[in-house]
């Protein structure tokens, strides 16, 4: 197996300005300097001519780089912002809908250098970085394989089922059909060479080059999130109804504590009310700074957290985020939970409409201006004099979907002296680590 290439969708705008910092070849000629493309009649206009697609290949791959202006990062998150970003590799433009998509084409190991630098802090330990290199590489190649399977299948792939009384939707990278993955948190945070990689990141990638998590002869769909909240979630409760043997419930701890059945409502509420010992139950800034970039460090309480809305605030928020008018919200009723206590289905009861929504990210998107920290929460209602709720408090656990590697837990394990293989096999139960190229 040779090192694969990857195509990354970086930005989506009707007009894109970019700088070729050295020579790039396009349509047989060499170009450099400031350029711009814009949408024109469903095609790409550049230098007064229109094209279905454009590709700029570096004249010298060792030194060539390009800069994209005003790339949006943190799309739909509370810290969404624009920044100029620098990339190596090739640059391709295509048209999708009413926008031009800028795509970066490059080798997997070069891509990983950016992902690890973007996802992790430069202060992270070598073992944590090595573990992250293996899961990021595995996740990426598993997604490419999955996309090929979906493309070759005669069955229509859908991430949503909807009826009058229920909307079940999950969010995965299958939204992307003309490139492998996107550059935002929807896939993996990728910012080219904008943030200089450190020697330790290069070392972690070099030491694990070509290593993949494998299970039953296939590359593992190696998911990760910030904090599992003490128990791992299972894949099928967050995405399609598919059970993977290596993504199963387990305590984020080496203790022998028995996990209560958190799919049972009473147990889930009691679990969230507690703050049990776990690898990811930490307030150690030295550890947290290894995982959280500056804008993530704005989040202080993540292992156990609380959010409060007045009835009016919640009603307006749900209308704005879902586009569905439930009227005044009367109740939020848990219908189904996963193995970590995360809600898979939630019933929204309003004066105009009642509906069940899921899965976990749909719930998180509907109940927050950006994303709730997780769907592992229970609801406390404050009742008014007319027996109508005047406020709702959501009390929750963890940060993210909780499937696979828990980044904060893994950082703590690294600090405690576990090596990267021990960290990986704690989170991906029964998997193996194989060098494939």
Locate each region found by the language model.
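Conserved, single-site charged/polar hotspot
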Residues: 1-437
